[in-house]
Curated annotation (Swiss-Prot):
One of its GO terms (biological process) is tyrosine catabolic process. InterPro entries: HgmA_C (IPR046451), HgmA_N (IPR046452), Homogentis_dOase (IPR005708), Homogentis_dOase_bac (IPR022950), RmlC-like_jellyroll (IPR014710), RmlC_Cupin_sf (IPR011051). It comes from the Bacteria. The keyword Oxidoreductase applies. Involved in the catabolism of homogentisate (2,5-dihydroxyphenylacetate or 2,5-OH-PhAc), a central intermediate in the degradation of phenylalanine and tyrosine. Catalyzes the oxidative ring cleavage of the aromatic ring of homogentisate to yield maleylacetoacetate. This is Homogentisate 1,2-dioxygenase. Its EC number is 1.13.11.5.
Length: 453
């Protein structure tokens, strides 16, 4: 028996100790909560053991190439047709979907925000999502959105699935228990989790703090996968064995519940009389996973110069243009800086890609002041960015001995599409009006005469 969860609660430490995972990225897994619940040798028996129903969940067209073909077979207490009734319109006004061209008065520019403050009212995860940027078009399955979340209440009898895209969740403050229909994941800051498109889940709080905060990348396009390593070879970066998929778990609950759906940018809700998280066994390769960012094995320059930040890519969602991502998930983890005769922080840059950044903890080496844990920044396509004046002076004059950049974890959602700012983000009280001043100290040093200045 792998794992059975009935009415899993947020504060159940014993249950947390029992959570189990299966290692690997994109594997064809199999798992059962009750012995004999998983059929052997076929997918759809005439009658399933325990009176379960067989159901397929497809994450790709049937005819997708084998390398990108994704599906899982679920064996559940009720088929999913019993998990929805007649829908009513629902409203989550701060969760926006591309294309979204909100009207606001904030002009184009480099932007940075302090953390969103804890809510004064009671909010669950769905109610706590705030969209910062959108890019592309969800109805054509292109682009992404960058969200922040802040909440303080469990989704006890509320459940959700997103038909518009997969959700990459990045906790910053407070651990989460993510209960999906295919299993349970405990996810803490410096870990991430991914919930595939269309998969039912709810999120519970874990821990004793008063608010939970983090970031979400909603990927409308091709699903996240591991980037190619090229000349790096067979190892390093995010290794497949470090991705963890939950074993089967189910919630056997007969009471009024609400199922919320996001579909083409609109929200709907329906009421049912039981929990939809009723998968007792499953097998396949379309599944949620978690990943500990601290297991990322960085590579870098070991003699001189600063390499491109693409070497820090954890996951990439590709497009038809090779090497051009719908969205990349990139981190800036602890690492040694050893390059000689080199300006070691990230260099000044203008980019075809648009960059949304967040900081989970510590300091970011290009912005030691002003960019704080829980904060955000946005540098859209072709807008210049780079180290602030303080970081430049410090790095330009530092003794170039080996230095470990430690106790830090920043990340970036980077997309080929321009990221449109929402009205909420443009008017957010934590927007730093003085952000551009961080570069004011970068004065002219050129005087026409040769030599280091």
């Amino acid at each position: 028996m792998d794992q059975t969860s009935i009415q899993a609660s947020s504060g159940d430490a014993a249950a947390a100790d029992q959570l189990k995972y299966m290692p690997g990225f994109g594997n064809d897994f199999e798992t059962e909560s009750l012995p004999g619940a998983l059929p052997q040798g076929q997918n759809s028996p005439q009658k399933c053991n325990y009176g379960l129903y067989a159901e397929q969940l497809s994450g790709s067209p049937f005819t997708a190439p084998r390398g990108t073909n994704e599906r899982s077979w679920l064996y559940r207490i009720r088929p999913s047709v019993r998990h929805t009734r007649r829908f009513s319109n629902a409203s989550y006004p701060l969760w926006k979907t591309a294309p979204c061209l909100d009207e606001h008065s904030l002009p184009l520019g480099q932007l940075r925000w302090d953390p969103i403050p804890p809510p004064e009212e009671r909010l669950n995860f769905l109610e706590g999502v705030r969209t910062i940027t959108t890019a592309g078009d969800a109805t054509t399955q292109v682009g992404m959105s960058a969200h922040a979340y802040v909440f303080n209440e469990d989704m006890v009898d509320d459940y959700f699935f997103n038909a518009d895209g997969e959700l990459l969740i990045v906790p910053q403050l407070g651990a989460l228990r993510v209960f999906t229909e295919m299993g349970i994941m405990d996810v803490e800051p410096s870990e991430i989790c991914l919930v595939p498109r269309g998969m039912m889940f709810k999120i519970l709080t874990s821990g004793k703090q008063t608010a939970w905060r983090g970031y979400i990348c909603e990927n409308y396009g091709a699903k996240f996968t591991l980037p190619e390593r090229g000349p790096i070879g067979a190892n390093c970066l995010a290794n497949p064995r470090d991705f963890k998929t939950p074993v089967a778990a189910y919630e056997d609950k007969e009471k009024p519940c609400r199922v919320h759906v996001k579909w083409c940018g609109k929200f709907y809700v329906t009421e049912i009389g039981h929990s939809p998280l009723d998968v007792v066994a499953w097998h396949g390769n379309y599944a949620p996973f978690k990943y500990d960012l601290r297991t990322f094995s960085p590579v870098g320059a070991i003699l001189f110069d600063h390499p491109d930040p693409s070497i820090f890519s954890v996951l990439t969602a590709p497009t038809e243009d090779a090497g051009t991502a719908n969205v990349d998930f990139v981190i800036f983890p602890p690492r040694w800086l050893v390059a000689e005769h080199t300006f070691r922080p990230p260099w000044y840059h203008r980019n075809i890609m648009s960059e949304f950044m967040g900081l989970i903890h510590g300091q970011y080496d290009a912005k030691e002041e002003g960019f704080v844990p829980g904060g955000m920044s946005l540098h859209n396509m072709m807008l210049p960015h780079g180290p602030d004046a303080l970081a430049f002076e410090k790095a330009a004059n530092a003794e170039l001995k080996p230095v470990k950049l430690d106790h830090t974890m920043a990340f970036m959602f980077e997309t080929r599409y321009p990221q449109q700012l929402t009205k909420y983000a443009a008017e957010l009280e934590t927007l730093q009006d003085d952000y551009l001043e961080c570069w004011d100290g970068l004065e002219r040093k050129f005087d026409g005469n040769p030599g280091i200045k």
